[in-house]
Amino acid sequence: MSKQIPTPYMWSYQPQSGRAAGASVDYSTRMNWLSAGPSMIGQVNDIRHTRNQILIRQALITETPRPVQNPPSWPASLLPQMTQPPTHLHLPRNEILEGRLTDAGMQLAGGGALAPRDLYALTLRGRGIQLNEDLPLSASTLRPDGIFQLGGGGRSSFNPTDAYLTLQNSSSLPRSGGIGSEQFVREFVPTVYINPFSGPPGTYPDQFIANYNILTDSVAGYD
C-alpha cells in the first residue's frame, strides 16, 4: 500500500460542549489488499487517492477560515445566528368576565368608624381603579385580565383594546461558545494529513492524538 496516500482522520463530536473531541484514523475505510496482486493494489490506491481529493475539496468549500482548526470556544462571528420574526398571538376578549372581575371586588379598608346598617345602606365596591387616586372610571383604567393596581404611581400601561401579544423569539445577544451538530458536519470534514509521521514528533498535531484534551490544550501523560 502506498504510504503517500494517507487514511483520513475522522473527527468526533462532543454534543455536551459543542466542540470537536478530537480526530482519529478511520481504519474501517481501509481495504483488504494483503492477498491482492499489483493490478488490484493499483486500483485500490486510485480509489483512496480519489477519495482524499474529494475530502480536500469538500473542506475548502464548507470549512470556515479560522486561525485554529478546533477552537475551544467559537466566537459569535463564526457561528450562524438564527434570526426569527416575532410571534404574534391573538388574545381573546371576554367582556362579561372582565366586568365581573373588576366590579366584584369589595373595598376592604376605608378608615371610617363602624355605623349601623340603616345609616349606610350603600356598599362600597372597588371599580378596578387605582385606590390612591381620585380618577373617574374609564376603559383605560381597566385591564382585560381583571387585575387592577391597588397602589402605586400611575395608571397601567396595558391597553385593554389591544387584542394581540408580540413575542420576541431571538436572543438580544449573539450566540457564542459551542457549535451544533449541523455546523460540525460542515466544519469538520475528514482531514487528509499528508505524511503525518514524516516530521519531528513536535510537529504532529496534538488534536490527532486520542487522549488530547481540548479544554486544557494538553495531552494526558505527555504534558
Swiss-Prot record:
The modification Phosphoserine is found at residue 170. Interacts with the peripentonal hexons as well as the hexons in the facets. Part of a complex composed of the core-capsid bridging protein, the endosome lysis protein VI and the hexon-linking protein VIII; these interactions bridge the virus core to the capsid. The keyword Phosphoprotein applies. It holds the Pfam family Adeno_PVIII. It comes from Porcine adenovirus A serotype 3. InterPro entries: Adeno_PVIII (IPR000646). One of its GO terms (molecular function) is hexon binding. It comes from the Viruses. This is Pre-hexon-linking protein VIII.
